Structure formats: structure tokens, C-alpha cells
UniProtKB/Swiss-Prot annotation:
Its main location: membrane. It comes from the Eukaryota. It comes from Apis mellifera ligustica (Common honeybee). The chain crosses the membrane at residues 19-39, 47-67, 76-96, 126-146. GO terms for cellular component: plasma membrane. Belongs to the G-protein coupled receptor 1 family. This is Olfactory receptor-like protein HbT3. Odorant receptor. The lineage of its organism: Eukaryota, Metazoa, Ecdysozoa, Arthropoda, Hexapoda. The keyword Kinase does not apply.
């Protein structure tokens, strides 16, 4: 978005096919490594008897609540990784939008109005999505609620993607 708005004439040169592939594959590789780490750790944990997972889908926090052993290290790992990925992602988007905002403020009044009307919905959708994800993954265990997390999970897995074509 930054390149398309701030330097539209350089977009096709800077966004090579190789870079586009890297930008798509990179998050998938990082997500796979993150998931495999937590999944491998979960296979090593002792579970007591038959249990039912209550949430909308099987997530790490509800799964850890079914373990018979101490899961503080696992919960800490989930918290640290989710926090680091979240902070890095949000900072990247925030810095990008600061540069975009500075470029928009240098435009003429007419161009500024058109750009704001075109681009303002994307940061809204991004920050709603990141806000719900932070709420789920980066919350103290004292405030953890399976029922509330189920509602928030439905929101960020179904509601936000459903409205994304209309917002963006």
C-alpha cells in the first residue's frame, strides 16, 4: 500500500515477481514454524481422560486448559510468540501508514480527499482484526474466559473476513 500510494510510478519496478512471492511465502513459513512448535510441544503434554474442547475451533489456550501438568511455560511461549509477531506486524503496518499519511498530506486538497476516501477503510479493517487477535492471544490468564474467547474467535475468523471485501 505504501509503495502504491507514495510512489505509484515505481510500483511495477520495485514490486518484482520475486519480491511478491517472498511477501506471500514468508508469513506462511513463519506461521508454519510457529504452529509446528506449539503443536509439537502439545503432543508431549499429558492429558487427563476424555475431555471436550469448548471453543469455536481448537486453539492453543483451550487445549492447554485440558492438560494435567504445569503449562506455565507453554502459556508463556504462546504469549511471547503471539506478542512478538503481533507487535512486529502492527509496528510494520503503523510505520507504513505514517509514511502514507505524510505523503497524503503533501498532496493537493482534491487528491487528498480522494486518497482518504479510498484508503481509510483498510487501516480500519486491519486494526479491528489485530485488536481482536491481541485480545485473544495477549491477555493475562487471570482474565481468560472460554465463552468470551469463542465470541471473539468467531468475530476474527468469520465476521471480519466476510466484511473485508466491502471495507477494503
Amino acid at each position: 500500500r505504501y509503495l502504491a500510494i507514495c510512489n505509484p510510478l515505481l510500483y511495477s519496478v520495485a514490486m518484482s515477481q520475486r519480491l511478491c512471492i517472498q511477501l506471500v511465502v514468508g508469513p506462511y513459513v513463519i506461521g508454519l514454524m510457529n504452529t509446528m512448535t506449539h503443536t509439537t510441544n502439545a503432543f508431549c503434554l499429558p492429558f487427563c481422560g476424555p475431555n471436550v474442547i469448548n471453543p469455536f475451533f481448537c486453539d492453543m489456550s483451550p487445549l492447554l486448559s485440558l492438560v494435567c501438568a504445569d503449562t506455565r511455560l507453554n502459556k508463556l511461549a504462546v504469549f511471547i510468540v503471539a506478542g512478538a509477531v503481533g507487535v512486529f506486524s502492527v509496528l510494520t503496518i503503523l510505520i507504513s501508514y505514517i509514511y502514507i499519511l505524510m505523503a497524503i498530506l503533501r498532496m493537493s486538497a482534491d487528491g487528498r480527499c480522494r486518497t482518504f476516501s479510498t484508503c481509510s477503510s483498510h487501516p480500519t479493517a486491519a486494526f479491528i482484526s489485530y485488536g481482536t487477535l491481541f485480545f485473544i492471544y495477549v491477555q493475562p490468564s487471570a482474565t481468560f474466559s472460554l465463552d468470551l474467547n469463542k465470541v471473539v474467535s468467531v468475530f476474527y475468523t468469520a465476521v471480519i473476513p466476510m466484511f473485508s471485501p466491502f471495507i477494503c
